[in-house]
């Protein structure tokens, strides 16, 4: 896309370089703009089937965890419809180039920033995925990836399938919330803080932050099937989406090259067991991950796509049943 072809929409930013790099070279992720919770109280977003559309891309870990939750819980497109942008973000923003005529069939837009500018003409942040749009009002109502899965797991329970797992059980909620903060700061966002760092000091600080936490998780998962014993929870979804991208994208693109996930016995077997669950596997697109990160999110002026790694290894058997017994969700 030439400079003449780049489209802008209101004041919406087109990259992380605008407003997300601090004076000391650290990457400081933007705050979410649309954070009204779903619920049944005044001022909350009504829990109503057919009213909302979720926009995602299989590149994005924040967006992918919404799809995993939908599939585990049985929230179908008759309840919340799903639109998908291409995995390579353009200079004009996330593009609906996978759809017929390059236009989302429900929202009628070509680029995601269009509806950000329409919803809030003064918005100066990036247009991000996941984004939840109220199709009745044709405006964004939530892009709070940090809390969205918990809404699907709780207040959207009337639309869960029979026998759906309780991913956010009441007796573990405070512990899940605490662990989720650690996973976010040291793993999910930790890889970005290393990858987008503008100084050697910030890169090294976050490099060590990520691998120190991976070492602790490796030890924990030697004795526990999931992060909370035998109970699959919201925290496992959050950890998985980073682990699934690590060897393909972060090891090379974000210079996190101390070890691959497949070099950790327990993290690797844990990751492959999760991948063996249809909800996780169906939401994981390794080609989209590779193209999105290595041809879009990282500097690659010649647009050369690496051939590796061999992601067929994700299909190989894991040892979790041998250690912990048959898998039950």
What are these regions (language model features)?
Residues 1-329:
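C-terminal alpha-helical interaction module
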